[in-house]
């Protein structure tokens, strides 16, 4: 059995720092408009060329187990920031490295790590307060496009995401898929769609497209399996008198009930399409209820005391149009009351906040989008697979950044906001003493690092630019692309406040923990066994 190695004090902290630096140095070359790419080896397929901090961090495993612990800690900073805000992972890594570097200098010089940590936490709380105070809400489509363009480093992508958000609303679902073509396009599926199609192909109205289109139909929603025609007859007769088509959403329609519907359709007495209810179990009940609210109908369920044979026209939902394909049903223009839909949306949002399961959250978000007005699909195309994967990652990042911006507003980008909150930390420093004051100073100094790194990646002297930006009015900063000093928000160089805040909070959290390390236990690296020597050439 391999023994463990134990390192203490300075040795432990320095070994961790080497790991932190190895990971951070690989990630930080991607920061800013002139950041470079990193190539990742893939065991299968071609290497991946990317610009996304968290994807690079995830790939890094160091050979030395102690250094690897340091790298894994910083990886957590990037991953956590990605989970919370979906972007800003490189910034978070750069901040963590700076806080660790400055903090270790002070610990080596004899500062008490526990008190330093207190100072760091105080400084971060103050900084977050300042970020929230200067954040501007995002209202226009242009502002959304700017946020997305900065995150993806591409104006076209910015416009595409802004257009998608405009079409499906802030709560709509926007998915990113790989396309076969060269260009990147946007498709919007309006209305509520679910993945169930017609039960019988005899129900189609358009044989060329193999789909059924019902205009201004009645919609019967039930959680029952319908097999006896006697259950359906009363409501069918009422619908026939109106001359409108009928959509039936039920657990299943079979036997004589299905045969009757098909015969009526073929004779032209009643245009009717039956589809199975979406989802399973409790989720099915919830989705049927969503459809009922969207179309101003009721779920005809014996659990609620309604029998199918007693159903009336007022219990049926209405919509402008329903399109039913082989495996999909789309309800467009449901006639539910906006207040009822709003209430339902608020209820689902509450459930999203409270759920702990990622799967449930994803399903709830899908339901929310379907109620809120549709689904947009961005089809990513490129000349090669390597380029397409890189582009898809950037679009996903930009999408996350945009959602974060809508949630908590925007601040000046390019590391500028961090520079302008330094003043508030200087004031805070005056009120503290001893090692706590040093902790605040560590964060104050670390806040310069993102801008410095952006400048270095643009081939300039970082500290000169930082000093110059400190003298500019709040909101003015350095545009690394044109190498000019500008009003950042007016120039469209913005970051979501949520990303700026999360990056700092997560970086400080992990860095402060690392500073308080006094001992470290790790596996001993195993020595590779030597194989037998080559035989002497004389013996050949």
From Swiss-Prot:
InterPro entries: Chaperonin_Cpn60_CS, Cpn60/GroEL, Cpn60/GroEL/TCP-1, GroEL-like_apical_dom_sf, GROEL-like_equatorial_sf, TCP-1-like_intermed_sf. It comes from the Bacteria. It holds the Pfam family Cpn60_TCP1. Its EC number is 5.6.1.7. It catalyses: ATP + H2O + a folded polypeptide = ADP + phosphate + an unfolded polypeptide. It is an enzyme of class 5 (isomerase). GO terms for molecular function: ATP binding; ATP-dependent protein folding chaperone; isomerase activity; unfolded protein binding. One of its GO terms (biological process) is protein refolding. ATP binds at residues 30-33, 87-91, 414, 479-481, 495. PROSITE patterns: CHAPERONINS_CPN60. It is found in: Cytoplasm. Together with its co-chaperonin GroES, plays an essential role in assisting protein folding. The GroEL-GroES system forms a nano-cage that allows encapsulation of the non-native substrate proteins and provides a physical environment optimized to promote and accelerate protein folding. Belongs to the chaperonin (HSP60) family. Forms a cylinder of 14 subunits composed of two heptameric rings stacked back-to-back. Interacts with the co-chaperonin GroES. This is Chaperonin GroEL.
């Amino acid at each position: 059995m391999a023994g463990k190695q134990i390192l203490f004090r300075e040795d432990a902290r320095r070994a961790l720092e080497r790991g932190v630096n190895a990971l951070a140095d690989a990630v930080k070359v991607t920061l800013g408009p002139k950041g470079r790419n990193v190539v990742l080896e893939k065991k299968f397929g071609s290497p991946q060329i990317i610009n996304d901090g968290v994807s690079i961090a995830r790939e890094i495993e160091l050979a030395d187990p102690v250094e690897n612990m340091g790298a894994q800690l910083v990886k957590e900073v990037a991953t956590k920031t990605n989970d919370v805000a979906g972007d800003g992972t490189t910034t978070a890594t750069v901040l963590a490295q700076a806080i660790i570097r400055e903090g270790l200098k002070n610990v080596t010089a004899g500062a008490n790590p526990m008190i330093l940590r207190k100072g760091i936490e105080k400084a971060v709380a103050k900084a977050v307060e300042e970020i929230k105070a200067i954040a501007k809400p995002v209202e226009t489509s242009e502002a959304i496009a700017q946020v997305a363009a900065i995150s993806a480093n591409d104006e076209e992508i910015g416009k595409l995401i802004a257009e998608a958000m405009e079409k499906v609303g802030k709560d709509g679902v926007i998915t990113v898929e790989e396309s076969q073509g060269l260009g990147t396009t946007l498709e919007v599926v309006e209305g509520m769609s679910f993945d169930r199609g017609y039960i019988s192909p005899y129900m189609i109205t358009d044989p060329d497209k193999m789909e059924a289109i019902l205009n201004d139909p009645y919609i019967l929603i039930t959680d029952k399996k319908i097999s006896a025609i006697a259950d359906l007859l009363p409501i069918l007769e009422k619908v026939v008198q109106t001359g409108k088509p009928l959509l039936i959403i039920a657990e299943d329609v079979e036997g004589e009930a299905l045969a009757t519907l098909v015969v009526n359709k073929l004779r032209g007495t009643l245009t009717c399409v039956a589809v199975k209810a979406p989802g399973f179990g409790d989720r099915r009940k919830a989705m049927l209820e969503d459809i009922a609210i969207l179309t101003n109908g009721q779920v005809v369920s014996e659990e609620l005391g309604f029998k199918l044979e007693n159903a009336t026209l007022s219990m049926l939902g209405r919509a402008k149009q329903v399109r039913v394909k082989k495996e999909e049903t789309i309800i467009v223009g449901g006639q539910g009351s906006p207040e009822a839909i709003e209430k339902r949306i608020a209820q689902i949002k509450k459930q999203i906040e409270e759920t702990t399961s990622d799967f449930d959250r994803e399903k709830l978000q899908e339901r929310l989008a379907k109620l809120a007005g549709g689904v947009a699909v961005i089809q990513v195309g490129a000349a090669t697979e390597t380029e397409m994967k890189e582009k898809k990652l950037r679009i996903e990042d930009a999408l996350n950044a945009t959602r974060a911006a809508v949630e908590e507003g925007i601040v000046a980008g390019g590391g500028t906001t961090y520079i302008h909150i330094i003043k508030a930390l200087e004031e805070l420093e005056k009120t503290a003493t001893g090692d706590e004051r040093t902790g605040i100073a560590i964060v104050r100094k670390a806040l310069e690092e993102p801008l410095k790194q952006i400048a270095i990646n643009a081939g300039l002297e970082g500290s000169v630019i930082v000093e110059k930006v400190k003298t500019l009015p709040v909101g003015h900063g350095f545009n690394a692309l044109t190498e000019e000093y500008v009003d950042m928000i007016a120039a469209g160089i913005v970051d979501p406040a949520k990303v700026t805040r999360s990056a700092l909070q997560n970086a400080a959290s992990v860095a402060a923990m690392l500073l308080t390390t006094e001992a470290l236990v790790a596996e001993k690296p195993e020595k590779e066994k030597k194989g037998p020597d080559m035989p002497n050439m004389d013996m050949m």
